[in-house]
Amino acid sequence: MVEKATLANGCFWCTETIFSRVRGVLSVMPGYSGGTIKNPSYREVCNGSTGHAECVQMEYDSTQIDFQTLLEVFFDTHDPTTLNKQGADVGTQYRSAIFYHDEQQLATAQDIIALKDNGFDNPIVTELIPFNVFYKAEVEHHDYYNLNPSQPYCRAVISPKVKKLITSHTQLLKEEL
């Protein structure tokens, strides 16, 4: 069964790159959610005036991977204890958030946060927000890492996250990688 998940954990280039490598994830689209204006641009979101988070919306086959496993990857590939910040990326657009699509996703998110919270030095600050609307990012942000692998941000920030995914979740990787 095809289901949707909408997750924010810093720069959407990172998040798209991670989840596009996970078996059972059918598609990953970078974009914006959680804000107050319609069809925001990257520039508007980055200046912090819209309230949107950079996020991804993915479609996944729930017969191959479940929402809990997606959240395991989510929490293992960013720091959910830093408020509105991931590394050098600072602002509400880089917050950690789960935009849940139904009550089951909410319950799963609450359960995994309760399980993982003791594993960090600081409390998890990931927001749980009912999903409302998702706006696709501009095309130049789609598949950014794969199209720009030698760009300094990709090498310094995204590549280490990919390595962490490979070492911590090898069994979840798509075979073609």
Report residues per predicted region.
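Flexible coil/turn and secondary-structure edge motifs
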Residues: 1-177
